[in-house]
Amino acid sequence: MKNRILVLLTVVALVVVMLAPVALAITKQCWASPCYGTNKDDTLYEHPRFNNKIYALRGDDIIRPALWRIRPAPDTDILRGGPGNDRLKSDDLDGRDVLYGGRGRDVCIINRGDRTRGCEKVGR
């Protein structure tokens, strides 16, 4: 019986060690800046009350304006896609944001006054 328990605990420990470095894709509201995604396909939301620096990292990511907004916030957000086909949206009505597409085919949705770099497609 003790041998079975020891074998079971060893197997569990090996599985935990093997799965520990695996990062899962996330969907999250960024509550601090800078805010980082993972190397998977993430969805990140900016915070409406302060200047955001959001880094999507690898994967086909989406960066969007905040989940809620009472009125346009005069903040300057920096949104950075990473390697992958990212969708960066800064249509938060302030026109002061900077979007960097990164490697891959990136789509940037902006307001008048926002700036882009490395976006293969730019729209409003």
Language-model-detected regions and their locations in the chain:
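Bacterial N-terminal signal peptides that target proteins for export
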Residues: 1-9
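N-terminal segments that cap or nucleate solenoid repeat domains
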Residues: 25-68
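Sequence contexts marking disulfide-bonded cysteines in secreted/extracellular proteins
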Residues: 29-36, 107-109, 118-120
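Glycine-centered beta-turn/loop sites at beta-strand termini
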Residues: 37, 46-48, 56, 65, ...
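Short, low-complexity, Pro/Ser/Thr/Gly-rich segments in the mature regions of secreted, periplasmic
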Residues: 114-124
